[in-house]
């Protein structure tokens, strides 16, 4: 949810800047609605967008901004409808596919989310953000092999993006590929030093394959990084 709000913040900021030269009726309503969204007063924002849309029913931005606000308010069905309307007015608006896909995922409509992400990837097959989104949707839809393909391809494009290795490691655990997961978590440790849980997770994985000495080394590193949960694992397995 934090990621959705952050992305929406960027969109709304852009809209506010654009509106300086926007003379269409209802401009002030849209500014007020955007401001209410930024202040997380979603009920007020939606009411203002409603008024704006009545005045400007052919302006896709009213529906799109209302949709992102509905996403933050967890009104996913309404958001889906607004993003669909956005795309009927502006079929090439990439952000609407992003958000509609997210609304589908929240409603567990994974096939529809995958369809939206694939629509963008057909035009831009090297889009790492959309590869990550589709991989997540595939995974939620129990299509783990396809999710792995997307993550493999994304890593080939963005070799230094630690989050990709983390996602792939988590997927490999589901696929019972412990050795593969350990290799990816090793990359995570190098690329994401701020992720303190990596040594604790690696310790648990080493225990699964009966490599207790390696597990204990990882638990020690986790404790050095103030990962409190590693203390019990170390006591139970390493003393």
Identify the role of each PLM range.
Residues 65, 99, 133, 167, ...:
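Canonical tetratricopeptide repeat
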Residues 26, 204, 208-239:
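Terminal, low-structured helical/coil segments at or just beyond the last alpha-helical repeat
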Residues 25-27, 60-61, 94-95, 128-129, ...:
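Helix-start (N-cap) detector for alpha-helical repeat units in TPR-like alpha-solenoids
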Residues 38-39, 72-73, 106-107, 136, ...:
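Register position in tetratricopeptide repeats
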């Amino acid at each position: 949810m934090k990621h959705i709000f952050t992305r929406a913040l960027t969109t709304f900021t852009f809209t506010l800047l654009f509106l300086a030269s926007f003379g269409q009726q209802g401009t002030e309503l849209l500014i007020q609605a955007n401001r209410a969204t930024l202040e997380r007063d979603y009920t007020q924002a939606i009411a203002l967008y409603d008024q704006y849309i009545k005045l400007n029913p052919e302006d896709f931005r009213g529906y799109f901004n209302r949709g992102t606000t509905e996403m933050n308010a967890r009104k996913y069905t309404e958001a889906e409808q607004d993003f669909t309307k956005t795309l009927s007015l502006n079929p090439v608006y990439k952000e609407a596919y992003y958000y509609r896909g997210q609304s589908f995922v929240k409603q567990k409509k994974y096939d529809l989310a995958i369809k939206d992400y694939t629509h963008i990837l057909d035009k831009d097959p090297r889009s790492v953000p959309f590869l990550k989104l589709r991989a997540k949707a595939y995974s939620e839809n129990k299509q783990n092999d396809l999710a792995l393909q997307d993550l493999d391809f994304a890593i080939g494009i963005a070799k230094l993006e630690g989050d990709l290795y983390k996602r792939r490691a988590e997927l490999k655990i589901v696929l019972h590929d412990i050795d593969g997961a350990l290799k990816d978590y090793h990359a995570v440790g190098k690329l994401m030093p701020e992720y303190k849980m990596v040594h604790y997770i690696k310790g648990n994985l080493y225990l699964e394959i009966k490599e207790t000495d390696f597990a204990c080394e990882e638990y020690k590193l986790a404790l050095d990084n103030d990962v409190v949960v590693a203390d019990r694992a170390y006591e139970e397995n390493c003393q």
